[in-house]
């Protein structure tokens, strides 16, 4: 039986891993074994942080809505409660943009919310 040389496949595999690790510091970009570990860890961080990014944006939107709602005499929780009672279905992302860029429209929304809360 003939001997199988896997040099071409091994070289391609190493090259692929080292290409992904380009820009890493020290041995993480030079040594195959360490580069492979670094890429696996980077993938774990990327997976985790894609989920954290969504949470962080939601927190940011809530902070912005709360700040502008308090400027108009409401807390965030009462604002959201009043919006559901008034039947206003604007998500937090859009509401935070309105709070930043269109304060007049946000004030009108707050007035509608206050009317819904007083009834």
Curated annotation (Swiss-Prot):
CDD domains: Ribosomal_L20 (cd07026)
GO CC aspect terms: ribonucleoprotein complex; ribosome
Keyword Ribonucleoprotein (UniProt): yes
Keywords associated with the record: Ribonucleoprotein, Ribosomal protein, RNA-binding, rRNA-binding
Superkingdom as given in the UniProt entry: Bacteria
Gene3D superfamilies: 6.10.160.10, Ribosomal protein L20
UniProt record, GO biological process: ribosomal large subunit assembly; translation
GO molecular-function term, one example from the UniProt record: structural constituent of ribosome
Family, as annotated: Belongs to the bacterial ribosomal protein bL20 family.
HAMAP family according to UniProt: Ribosomal_bL20
Function comment: Binds directly to 23S ribosomal RNA and is necessary for the in vitro assembly process of the 50S ribosomal subunit. It is not involved in the protein synthesizing functions of that subunit.
Entry-linked NCBIfam families: rplT_bact (TIGR01032)
Protein name: Large ribosomal subunit protein bL20
Gene this chain is encoded by: rplT
């Amino acid at each position: 039986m003939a001997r199988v040389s896997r040099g071409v496949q091994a070289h391609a595999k190493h090259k692929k891993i080292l290409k992904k690790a380009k820009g890493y510091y020290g041995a993480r970009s030079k040594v195959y074994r360490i580069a492979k570990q670094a890429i696996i860890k980077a993938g774990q961080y990327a997976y985790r942080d894609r989920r954290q990014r969504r949470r962080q944006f939601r927190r940011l939107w809530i902070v912005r809505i709360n700040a502008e709602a308090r400027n108009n005499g409401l807390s965030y929780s009462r604002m959201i409660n009043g919006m559901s009672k008034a039947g206003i279905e604007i998500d937090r992302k859009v509401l935070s943009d309105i709070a930043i860029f269109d304060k007049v429209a946000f004030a009108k929304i707050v007035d509608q919310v206050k009317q819904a809360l007083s009834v």
